[in-house]
Amino acid sequence: MISKLTKIVATISDLRCEPEHIKDLHDAGVNVIRLNTAHQSHEDTIKVIDNVRKISNKIALMIDTKGPEVRTANIENPIIVKTGDKVIISTSPINEPNNFQTNYDGFVKEVPQGSKVLIDDGELEMTVVAKLPDRLICEIKNDGQIKNKKSINTPGISLKLQSVTEKDKGFIELAAKYNVDFIAHSFVRHSKDVQDVQEILTASGNPDVKIISKIENQEGIDNIEEIAKASYGIMVARGDMGVEIPAEDVPIAQLKITQTCIKYGIPVITATQMLHTMIENPRPTRAEVSDIANAILNGTDAIMLSGETAYGKYPIEAVKMMTSIAKKVEKHRKMTLYKDELFYDKSITRNYIIKCAIDATKLMDIKAIIVDSLKGKTARIMATYRASVPLFITTNSERLARELALSYGVYSNLVDNNFKRTTEFVVTSLKMLKEQGVVNDKDTVIIISGNPNRNIEKGTEFMEINTVEDAIKGRNI
């Protein structure tokens, strides 16, 4: 049975990746497993990939790159600072107190006087009060300490960092080699960043790995339209985003990004600290529950767990909680959130049929929508309407089934054969759904398909509304 329409992405590490644990996560509602390469080696990653595939060929895999970042460097002992103190960020070590460098050679050159500099995910704030050719002199704004290899953010400042690091390149090549489904690339600022990742995948012999662009700063937000056009999907990565832009601007950015993804018919993932309390506690805060609910009400395809499942004390409970919240919210949302003209281009038959099917779900008691989607495009566009009934595709492509694991309300059944005629597809699909207990003979379903000869790829061409029993009998096979 299908318990929810919203998809769940869960982060796991090699420290807790036994097949039994992965199965428990999957049974609790996880659709996609995420691997954070910031904390893993190639060997660790391969171990997790192998274990996931032992459990199910329908669980999608996502490798998350570390991306370009600036960190503190050459600090032997923590620098203790108080409000009003001065520190020096220099291009190379100098004989001055409170001095440190960064791992990015262009930092001093590219950061102007007056800029805000944040250390360790925003824990320490300083302002550049003077600039010399080889150093920035900064004034501390709050008490704290500066440790080695801590993150540095410069809100509103565009640094000329390379889009793909050597470490990223190695993991992208690994994703291509092991046929991973998604690459989530960090700190995407322009469509060119997406193209850079695609070039590595193509050169590695697997251009079909799908790219999820992580939006984490103002540049990415400003360029969301061009990034969405170039990407398979988008992740709203609210951790670094909440450091790079004012915290009160994050909900507005989240909504803008979600609406842009809906506009272009691509999946969107809402991420970071969704059930952060459950890393240490068995129950979430009311604010966390509301955060998840609002993400779903705003139209997200998927919601993500990070530390909650990677190293938290209650990983299965966190997934079950997320599933429970999703099920409840989905029952109380409007049938569809979006305008009637969404994807309503009458020159494209597919879009007209999709719109008719969505309208039918509002007026009739429809149990399920069965979509004959050879490449997934029709299913992804239908998902964008966020209908209140699940969409099912039957396919012999494991890759397609896993790609659709990110799309709202879309579920896949895998078969061995490649249907030659639509009749075979419909009958097989309905019989499988009956066996799974999703539908019974008297339930009404919508069937969407293309040319009766499935070898002729002409796209979506017809819609049928029928009971399961009559749809099978009418095909007489």
Swiss-Prot record:
Which InterPro entries does this one have?
Answer: Pyr_Knase (IPR001697), Pyrv/PenolPyrv_kinase-like_dom (IPR015813), Pyrv_kinase-like_dom_sf (IPR040442), Pyrv_Knase-like_insert_dom_sf (IPR011037), Pyrv_Knase_AS (IPR018209), Pyrv_Knase_brl (IPR015793), Pyrv_Knase_C (IPR015795), Pyrv_Knase_C_sf (IPR036918)
The catalysed reaction is: pyruvate + ATP = phosphoenolpyruvate + ADP + H(+)
Top-level division of the source organism's lineage:
Bacteria
Q: Where is this site: Transition state stabilizer?
A: K214
Task: Report residues binding Mg(2+).
Answer: E216, D240
E.C. designation(s)? 2.7.1.40
Q: Please tell me which top-level EC class this enzyme sits in.
A: transferase
Which positions does UniProt annotate for K(+) binding?
N36, D64, T65
Q: Which UniProt keywords apply?
A: ATP-binding, Glycolysis, Kinase, Magnesium, Metal-binding, Nucleotide-binding, Potassium, Pyruvate, Transferase
Subunit info here reads:
Homotetramer.
Q: What protein family does this chain belong to? A: Belongs to the pyruvate kinase family.
Protein name as it appears in the record: Pyruvate kinase
Q: Which gene encodes it?
A: pyk
